[in-house]
């Protein structure tokens, strides 16, 4: 006997969260809970404004239609990426095919203060990895901050994300302020320039490795080994079903590329599932999941070690 619930939710964000020049005041999304006999599975559907092609209202419409079809015995996955991902997670939990083991070692997001980062890294076992957003301020400032961090913490490796913010000139201005002796400790820089060709040129000219992120979701993208390209950053909420995520990870690994499972600012429920996916598909790589502290609450499932208050399922708005 099948049953299902769909919940709508909204979490207040910290004041300083800006995405693509838009201030994100709340994180809005949906949960689906599928039950069959004694088993149940949960999934999160939370399109990311400015990044997802669909709105959460559109996702809600597709999700409710899919749930009604599933209750009638149809299991075909929807095409909309955020819905496909959430539904496939719920089905995987229901079938017990999403392993419970999780990788909660998130690469901490750094605001540029080395003292703050040293404290965060002190408790991190093994490899010291942190992430810095660049491209929000002047490229020269970004270069100076990155250089300062690498100089202050000799065993640090940085992941940088520019979200295609730079022209070739700005990319050169950034690199000019990063000591060439430190550049090998930049694990990768995600999408430095507005075009892939400019990003490839940046990697060749600076010796700083790059990673593809937005490019993975463009119709002309193909997985190929390229000089200067070291990694792909996979955001499942923007990608689609668990199977599609797994295919992308396998394609990257086959070329010797690092695959990083990364957050699209999901709630704690979605983040804990991403931690499980990371442990399953990319066990040797620290995922990019350090986004929970951008929110003012957790929901339904806790992230280990977080002190944020938890909103239980009874407090959510039920749609079905």
From Swiss-Prot:
It comes from the Bacteria. InterPro entries: Enolase-like_C_sf, Enolase-like_N, Enolase_C-like, Mandelate_racemase_C, OSB_synthase_MenC1, OSBS_N. Pfam families: MenC_N (PF21508), MR_MLE_C (PF13378). Its EC number is 4.2.1.113. It is an enzyme of class 4 (lyase). Keywords: Lyase, Magnesium, Menaquinone biosynthesis, Metal-binding. It catalyses: (1R,6R)-6-hydroxy-2-succinyl-cyclohexa-2,4-diene-1-carboxylate = 2-succinylbenzoate + H2O. Mg(2+) binds at residues 161, 190, 213. GO terms for biological process: menaquinone biosynthetic process. The active site is at residues 133, 235. Belongs to the mandelate racemase/muconate lactonizing enzyme family. MenC type 1 subfamily. PANTHER family: O-SUCCINYLBENZOATE SYNTHASE, O-SUCCINYLBENZOATE SYNTHASE-RELATED. Converts 2-succinyl-6-hydroxy-2,4-cyclohexadiene-1-carboxylate (SHCHC) to 2-succinylbenzoate (OSB). This is o-succinylbenzoate synthase. The gene is menC.
């Amino acid at each position: 006997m099948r049953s299902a619930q769909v919940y709508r939710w909204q979490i207040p964000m910290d004041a300083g969260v800006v995405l693509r020049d838009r201030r994100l005041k709340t994180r809005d999304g949906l949960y689906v809970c599928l039950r069959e006999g004694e088993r149940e599975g949960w999934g999160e559907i939370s399109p990311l404004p400015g990044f997802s092609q669909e709105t959460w209202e559109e996702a809600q419409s597709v999700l409710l239609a899919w749930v009604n079809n599933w209750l009638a015995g149809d299991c075909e996955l929807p095409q909309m990426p955020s819905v496909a991902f959430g539904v496939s997670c719920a089905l995987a939990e229901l079938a017990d095919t999403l392993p419970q083991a999780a990788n909660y070692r998130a690469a901490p997001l750094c605001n540029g203060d080395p003292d703050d980062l040293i404290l965060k890294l002190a408790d991190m076992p093994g490899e010291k990895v942190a992430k810095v957003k660049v491209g929000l301020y002047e490229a020269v400032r970004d270069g100076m901050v990155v250089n300062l961090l690498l100089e202050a913490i000799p065993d640090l490796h940085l992941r940088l994300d520019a979200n295609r913010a730079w022209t070739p000139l700005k990319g050169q201005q950034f690199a000019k302020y990063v000591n060439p002796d430190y550049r090998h400790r930049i694990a990768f820089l995600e999408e430095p320039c507005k075009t892939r060709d400019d990003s490839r040129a940046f990697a060749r000219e600076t010796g700083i490795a790059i990673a593809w992120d937005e490019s993975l979701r463009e119709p002309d993208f193909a997985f190929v080994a390229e000089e200067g390209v070291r990694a792909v950053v996979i955001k499942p909420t923007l990608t689609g079903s668990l199977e599609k995520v797994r295919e992308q990870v396998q394609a990257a690994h086959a070329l010797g590329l690092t695959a990083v499972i990364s957050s699209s600012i999901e709630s704690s429920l979605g983040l804990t599932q991403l931690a499980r996916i990371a442990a399953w598909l990319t066990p040797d790589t620290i995922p990019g999941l350090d986004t929970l502290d951008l929110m003012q609450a957790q929901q339904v499932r806790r992230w280990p070690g977080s002190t944020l208050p938890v909103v239980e399922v009874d407090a959510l708005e039920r749609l079905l």
